[in-house]
Amino acid sequence: MEYHPSSQSPQVNPGMESQQGGYTYTYQQPAPPNSLHLQHPSILTRLPPLSSSVVSPSLASLPPFTPTSTYHSIAALTPPSYPQSSSAPSNNSYTIVPSPHDPSNAYSMHHVLQNTAPQSVPSPSPIEMVPPSPPKTGSNNSAPVTGKTVQSGNALNNSGLVKRQARKRTKTGCLTCRKRRIKCDERKPICYNCIKSKRQCEGYTHFPRPSGTFTASRRIPVSSLLSEPAPHGLAGQPTHPTFLYYIQSVAPSLCLWDACHFPPLSPYSSFSSIYWSSTVPELALRNPNISVALYAFASAKRHLTDDAVAFARQARVALTNITTTDSLLILVLLAVTQLYIPKSDIQLFNFAVDQVVKFDASLMTSPSDEIITYLLRRMFIRQVVLAGIVKPLASGLNPLPLLKCDLPPATTPTAVLDESLFHLGLRKLCHEKGLEPEFTKWSKNCPIDKADLPRLALLMIHAVFTSPVSLAQWVELILQNPDPTPAIHIARACLLAVHGVVDLGDLQMKVEKCVQSCEERQLQATISNFSTEVAQTNSSALAIGCQ
């Protein structure tokens, strides 16, 4: 909506009632997504709550902005309200929403937060949005101008509007698809084109919001959420110390663990960074159940046991059916919290293990749901491992079914070793102590670099809980390493781990041949070095004798 002083109106104080007749109101439709109108700073951080119909915690479920004639108003820096003249009553229901800093505390977002589902948000007509234009002051009493835009400093002309619409098509897709000049399906946070072509999705510069709001067409960074108080009606508190701890410590740690496992350019890697650092905090600000579960998890990481117990009890009431990735996120956060509190909820933990393993793939509505489920499984297994390293898990907790989750096969020796990290704590869980003397004895007989011992131990532990078929394939792959020495130790560790469990005769023969070959080369190298040293000593002695 734009208002401009009429050339025929007297120049008087705009606060006077008589000035109402001195303005011409025009309506321009549709409003451009990046309007140049000034907006209140709080509008840029106001996020509507997720509707119950949204099944994905990512932004993929939000509908794209369409150039249809919908204009949903949010109070920005609207012009001052001019009271209606008593002589010219109006039936217009348009009212200006007060600022959130209004001392009257009358600020309310009920007109924004009623229902964000796109199918239930009506499109108000221009009559509902714009107050009727009073008749021009003059002798001809002509009809008010309602369809023509009056030019002003902040108004967009028609050509500018056309440019904005034409440019919008290239700014809503991901950066990778825009560089490739192909149509992007705009799934968030990674489009399906990048997943299918195995390219790194560089993300979006435009994240559409539900059609019930009209905000700046840009993705709200988490840093801006931390600098402003939480808008009225949202669940999370961006300035809460526990929330800040998650943003500054927990989320980077989760991203780092995933980055160590996934290839740098894989979609999983970029998805993980966006999901833990941005999507989950934004969900916590909108959804009170996710917020409480996140606070419980972060409090446990901060070693605030009492807070973790209190938050976990509060969130436990909200658990019903696990049918979406949102509810799965809540369940995993609460289950991980049980690993760090004194009196663990064994029933909740084992229920979470069962749900994570058996989560119905038919409920997934997009590729992002599948990736989110995979990330949550990974995170759950990893937290069990890390907790088991610190202390034995509480009696009754049974995380072993997590090992049956489908994991992608390792393709490099480094991936094999990294894969074993997820199962490091399971040795204590299963009390597999019989392997340690064998491994220690073998290590003493075949000394290696001490820096390799932890990685070899990880692989040996992992081999206990790995199927023999994949273990044999991994050993075959490791033996192809150009440097045979670490490969031999890794293969021997695997064979010790599965000794008496499965017959790997052929594989053992290959390992023994590799060991023998390596020992022969080491012996030859030792003899060669000794011969060189003897020759140098003799030549030095001859030189001294000649002097």
UniProtKB/Swiss-Prot annotation:
Subcellular location field: Nucleus
Bias (Polar residues): 1-18, 136-160
Keywords (A to Z) from UniProt: DNA-binding, Metal-binding, Nucleus, Transcription, Transcription regulation, Zinc
The entry's DNA-binding region: 174-201
Gene Ontology molecular function: DNA-binding transcription factor activity, RNA polymerase II-specific; RNA polymerase II cis-regulatory region sequence-specific DNA binding; zinc ion binding
One cellular component (GO) term of this entry: chromatin
Any matching Pfam family: Zn_clus
Residue ranges with Pro residues bias: 121-135
Chain intervals for the UniProt region annotation (Disordered): 1-41, 80-165
InterPro entries with a match to the protein in the record: Transcr_Regulatory_Proteins, Zn2-C6_fun-type_DNA-bd_sf, Zn2Cys6_DnaBD
GO biological process: galactose-specific flocculation; negative regulation of flocculation; negative regulation of transcription by RNA polymerase II; regulation of transcription by RNA polymerase II
Main subcellular location of this protein, as a coarse class: nucleus
Bias type Low complexity, positions: 19-29, 83-94
Domain of life of the source: Eukaryota
Protein name: Uncharacterized transcriptional regulatory protein C15D4.02
Annotated source species: Schizosaccharomyces pombe (strain 972 / ATCC 24843)
